[in-house]
Design a protein with these regions (language model features):
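Metal-dependent phosphoesterase core characteristic of DEDDh/y 3'-5' exonuclease domains
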Residues: 4-8, 18-24, 28-58, 81-217
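Metal-dependent phosphoesterase signature
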Residues: 53-80
Length: 217
């Protein structure tokens, strides 16, 4: 299947091992278009200290009025079965957050593995395709590939007014989605399969495509 035909669920979480997930955001994309999105804050597992409030840009008192992330079980189980792949920027972090709450999804498609994968990883893809960049942070990639204006446009449409900046869950998920969608305009990648993109997301020589085939920059 061509990757553009796949339904991709782009996810971002804000939180830590200590606090648990304090905010989630996801964007479902298909044929380079956003088909749905959702975001919400979550009641943390532990009281946020001032440093964490500053880091997340969230107030503990306000967060305490929200449901815990564990109450979102059905949402994420259903999301997993509704998409062909999950996607995140540094997907191991998002996968570990999910596993903190639910080690594996209890709902699966026929022949789907008992895991939260497969994952596209925008950080790994860009490391493999553009190895000379050096900085693969989400904000740097958005700036490097002139996605700032489109990100602001999408954020104004989908994000709450107070959560339209980096390190806000839906904002970052939208940024990752743009990094995937821009490949539709690159002929060498636009025609590739979903399996190719999954291999480009992998780390390690045995799992990765030949870098000579991948490197574009």
């Amino acid at each position: 299947m061509n990757w553009q035909k796949a339904k991709i669920g782009v996810i971002d979480f804000e939180g830590s091992v200590r606090t648990g997930i304090v905010e989630y955001g996801y964007v479902a994309i298909n044929r380079s278009k956003i088909i749905n999105s959702e975001t919400s804050c979550c009641n943390p597992s532990k009281t946020l200290v001032p440093e964490e409030e500053k880091s997340f840009g969230l107030d503990h008192t306000a967060l305490s009025t929200h449901a815990h992330f564990s109450d979102k079980r059905e949402l994420f189980m259903n999301l997993h079965t509704s998409v062909d792949v999950f996607c995140a920027h540094h997907s191991a972090i998002e996968e570990n957050f999910l596993k903190m709450h639910w080690p594996y999804p209890t709902k699966r498609k026929l022949f789907q593995a008992a895991s939260w994968g497969p994952w596209l990883d925008t950080r790994k893809i860009y490391e493999n395709l553009y190895p000379s960049l050096g900085d693969f942070s989400l904000s740097h990639l958005v700036q490097t590939f002139d996605l700032d204006e489109k990100l602001r446009e999408n954020a104004s449409k989908y994000c709450p007014p107070e959560r339209r900046e980096p390190h806000c869950a839906l904002y970052d998920a939208l940024a990752s989605a743009l990094l995937i969608n821009r490949f539709k305009d690159i002929p060498e990648i636009a025609c590739t399969s979903l399996e190719w993109m999954l291999q480009a997301s992998a780390s390690g020589k045995k799992k990765r495509l030949d870098l000579d085939q991948l490197s574009l920059f």
